[in-house]
């Protein structure tokens, strides 16, 4: 398969994730869309790495996935805290959590 097709797929996934972040109000859905955007960037990194014949992009994508795993833990903890305090997972309610 042509590597350019993978870049088109990465751009499509990033656009879907960006539109989900801008349109949706549910914190869990917004969080999933951010993760989709991150995975689209990883796909582009691996594709560019494969096109140029070195492993740098694949290594960066691997470390990005490790950091994303930690991000999932922190993000879900914040969403659970929001749901427990406001009984809603809406992004609009997150602004009410200020000290």
Curated annotation (Swiss-Prot):
How does the record classify its membrane topology?
Multi-pass membrane protein
Catalytic reactions on record: a quinone + NADH + 5 H(+)(in) = a quinol + NAD(+) + 4 H(+)(out)
Residues annotated as transmembrane = 3-23, 28-48, 59-79
Q: Where does the protein principally reside? A: membrane
Looking at the record's lineage, which domain of life comes first?
A: Bacteria
Q: Which family does it belong to?
A: Belongs to the complex I subunit 4L family.
Q: What is this protein called?
A: NADH-quinone oxidoreductase subunit K 1
Q: Which organism is it from?
A: Streptomyces griseus subsp. griseus (strain JCM 4626 / CBS 651.72 / NBRC 13350 / KCC S-0626 / ISP 5235)
